[in-house]
Amino acid sequence: MDHLPQLVAEARAAIESAEDVQSLDEVRVRYLGKKGEITALLKGLGKLPAEERPKAGEQINDAKQVLSDELEARKKHLQDAELNARLAQERIDVTLPGRGEPTGGLHPVTRTLERIESLFAHIGFDVAVGPELEDDYHNFEALNIPAHHPARGMADTFYFDASRLLRTHTSPVQVRTMKEQAPPIRIVCPGRVYRSDSDLTHTPMFHQVEGLLVDEDVSFADLKGTIEDFLKAFFERESLSVRFRPSYFPFTEPSAEVDIQCVMCGGDGCRVCSHSGWLEVMGCGMVHPEVFRHSGIDAERYTGFAFGMGAERLTMLRYGVNDLRLFFENDLRFLRQFG
């Protein structure tokens, strides 16, 4: 018992000099472990006279408590120091720019659709939509294409049954709008349409935008000016040459195909324009009186014009893409070029 103070002093010095948690644990085992030097004193209490044992036991337990407290305090100090050292090595410079997360972008066809809608919105056109699953009446008959009409052969149609089909154009939206809304009417009708065709320039599903203007005293000159201004704005070429060729559509009379000067060669002739210097981009015409009759509009009072264009076709020309199918293959290497 006489050397207890000396053991405590040695243990405290060893605790203070321990440089890491492992060394500190070795000090604990040496003095307070099952075979530790101070623990051994407790085992030797039986050799003391009975009257000295309580006091000696109390002194040993006090010494153990003091050393346990100092061991715990030293351990916390060493752990904090170790953590601070590790944090210093792993320090993050918060002034560095963060890592950007990859973000998606609009599909090129979606960009084209939004651009078309925006350009026509600037001149007072609203956007109208309708069902993709159509009935025979709105898709054909109301557009002056009755049963057995030769024009029905222009589109290989996906039929569900004798009266239901996937729409072959967005013109039915025009009919539905004219039935529900009195003139004046100014709308563009973007949407998916379906035809049984697939090659470099055709897909079974594609996007079409059709437009309609109905009012009093609307003339072909109004149609011509609207189309020319739109195409120059869309392709961002004020000097773009536009021409109108007589054509035939059952729902317009007169009708015309619209060509623009080839945006690839500037009209000099190239593979894209078949060396003609011109590219066909849309069809148009004055609304046929029969379409007005089916829609409940007085053809004696009102006139109007309609036009239609393929969004993929315009996208190909705007971005220089030579295969329509690329827009639907979901190849990110291709699509990222437009992000």
UniProtKB/Swiss-Prot annotation:
SUPFAM superfamilies: Class II aaRS and biotin synthetases (SSF55681), tRNA-binding arm (SSF46589). One of its GO terms (biological process) is phenylalanyl-tRNA aminoacylation. It is an enzyme of class 6 (ligase). Its EC number is 6.1.1.20. It comes from the Bacteria. GO terms for cellular component: cytoplasm. It catalyses: tRNA(Phe) + L-phenylalanine + ATP = L-phenylalanyl-tRNA(Phe) + AMP + diphosphate + H(+). InterPro entries: aa-tRNA-synth_II (IPR006195), aa-tRNA-synth_II/BPL/LPL (IPR045864), Phe-tRNA-synth_IIc_asu (IPR004529), Phe-tRNA_ligase_II_N (IPR004188), Phe_tRNA_ligase_alpha1_bac (IPR022911), Phenylalanyl-tRNA_Synthase (IPR002319), tRNA-bd_arm (IPR010978). Binds 2 magnesium ions per tetramer. Mg(2+) binds at E253. Its cofactor is Mg(2+). GO terms for molecular function: ATP binding; magnesium ion binding; phenylalanine-tRNA ligase activity; tRNA binding. Transmembrane segments: none annotated. The keyword Aminoacyl-tRNA synthetase applies. Keywords: Aminoacyl-tRNA synthetase, ATP-binding, Cytoplasm, Ligase, Magnesium, Metal-binding, Nucleotide-binding, Protein biosynthesis. It is found in: Cytoplasm. PANTHER family: PHENYLALANINE--TRNA LIGASE, MITOCHONDRIAL, PHENYLALANYL-TRNA SYNTHETASE. Tetramer of two alpha and two beta subunits. Belongs to the class-II aminoacyl-tRNA synthetase family. Phe-tRNA synthetase alpha subunit type 1 subfamily. This is Phenylalanine--tRNA ligase alpha subunit. It comes from Chromohalobacter salexigens (strain ATCC BAA-138 / DSM 3043 / CIP 106854 / NCIMB 13768 / 1H11). The lineage of its organism: Bacteria, Pseudomonadati, Pseudomonadota, Gammaproteobacteria, Oceanospirillales. The gene is pheS.
